[in-house]
A protein has these predicted regions:
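Glycine-rich nucleotide cofactor-binding entry segment
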Residues: 1-108
Length: 110
């Protein structure tokens, strides 16, 4: 991926020797994942769980699959799934998610 020169220089300042590997990582294929809805009864078993997430799994899910359409699973990258784990909001707490589109993190936090 080609980045503006200023972007590259900024990350070289921040990351030093690790900057090249960081910038090269943008050429890697994105990791696909999904999370299951713990409020739905599961009759399917899933393999390849994402560490440190209670409902996350690696893999692809079609938006047209019965599991997705019925709300059993939701496509969501691993990093987005970690937000709820880190935030751990308590009941009744108000949360403002400034990156809430299409709403996956918001539904997970609810």
């Amino acid at each position: 991926m080609n980045f503006p020169e200023g972007f590259v220089k900024k990350y070289e300042e921040i990351l030093g020797d690790e900057a090249r590997a960081f910038l090269a990582s943008f050429d890697d294929e994105a990791v696909s994942a999904f999370r299951i809805n713990p409020l739905k009864e599961r009759q399917l078993s899933f393999s390849d769980p994402i560490p440190n997430t209670p409902w996350g799994y690696y893999g692809k899910v079609s938006g047209k699959s019965p599991e997705h359409v019925t709300g059993l699973v939701y496509s969501q990258e691993p990093a987005a799934q970690m937000v709820a784990q880190v935030a751990q909001p308590s009941s009744g707490m108000k949360v403002l998610d400034l990156a809430a589109a299409p709403g996956g993190k918001s539904t997970q936090l609810a």
